[in-house]
Each structure stands twice: as C-alpha cells, then as structure tokens.
C-alpha cells in the first residue's frame, strides 16, 4: 500500500546552502520532518549547480514523517538578472529599461529551463523567456 501524503511544502532554497534556519527549519519542523536529513540530501543533490542560486524545491511529506523532494531549475527572473548584470528589475518596465539581454543569452537560459517550461520547441521556450525579460524591464535583442 502506498504511503499517505500529509503535506506538500514549496520552498526556494539556495543551491548547496540548505541549513536548519528559516525558511527550511520552521517549514519542515511543523510537519515533523528530520530537518538535517533534508538539508544533507538537498545539498548533495544541488552540488553540481552554482552555489547560492535559489532553487525551487517541492517536498512531499508522508504520514510516517518520511519525505521525498523534487528540485526544479532556477527561476527565469534570477537567470535573466544575472545575464543582464542587474540586481533588480525595473519598477516601470514599459517606460524605464534597466538592461539588455541578447538572443544567445535567452537561448542559454531557455536550455537550462526547458525541463520546467511547457514549450514543446526551443523557439517557443526562447519567446517565453523573452516575455519574462520584457516584463522585468529588459531590452531584448534579436527576438
């Protein structure tokens, strides 16, 4: 018989830097999950990623206090800010542009995000990422 699911927990944790402090500790502690076990497993799984990049994770907690988790790719906004060399998007994206991204940068981000995007083709994924860039106040070259 399958284990009964008690909760789903969605968090964004920096790759390779999970520790028991907030937000990880309180979110897992209230469900009775072994926090250090999660931190060690998460850090091991995100070891190949660039340290410090926020990584979305969905933790499934079962009624016997065991858990499984699934990591997603880094949010597109974070990758776009890194590619454009800015710290935050524009407060007025339609009138005030804060940076520029090229087609090559968009393709690189789309490749990294393709598993999490619903786009069937690479061109559609690039257009999706370009739309995110425009909504952040970035100029998009070549699309």
UniProtKB/Swiss-Prot annotation:
GO terms for biological process: translation. The keyword Ribonucleoprotein applies. The keyword Hydrolase does not apply. One or more lysine residues are methylated. It holds the Pfam family Ribosomal_L11_N. InterPro entries: Ribosomal_uL11, Ribosomal_uL11_bac-typ, Ribosomal_uL11_C, Ribosomal_uL11_C_sf, Ribosomal_uL11_CS, Ribosomal_uL11_N, Ribosomal_uL11_N_sf. One of its GO terms (molecular function) is large ribosomal subunit rRNA binding. CDD domains: Ribosomal_L11. Forms part of the ribosomal stalk which helps the ribosome interact with GTP-bound translation factors. This is Large ribosomal subunit protein uL11. It comes from Stutzerimonas stutzeri (strain A1501). The lineage of its organism: Bacteria, Pseudomonadati, Pseudomonadota, Gammaproteobacteria, Pseudomonadales.
């Amino acid at each position: 018989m399958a284990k009964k699911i008690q909760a789903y927990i969605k968090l964004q944790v920096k790759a390779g830097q999970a520790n028991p402090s907030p937000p990880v500790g309180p979110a897992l502690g209230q469900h009775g999950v072994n926090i250090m076990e999660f931190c060690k497993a998460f850090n091991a799984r995100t070891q190949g990623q660039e340290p410090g990049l926020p990584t979305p994770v969905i933790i499934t907690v079962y009624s016997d206090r065991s858990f499984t988790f699934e990591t997603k790719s880094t949010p597109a906004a974070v990758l776009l800010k890194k590619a454009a060399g800015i710290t935050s998007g524009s407060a007025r994206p339609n009138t005030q542009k804060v940076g520029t991204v090229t087609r090559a940068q968009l393709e690189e981000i789309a490749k990294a995000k393709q598993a999490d995007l619903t786009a069937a083709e690479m061109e559609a994924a690039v257009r999706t990422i370009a739309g995110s860039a425009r909504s952040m106040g970035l100029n998009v070259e070549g699309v």
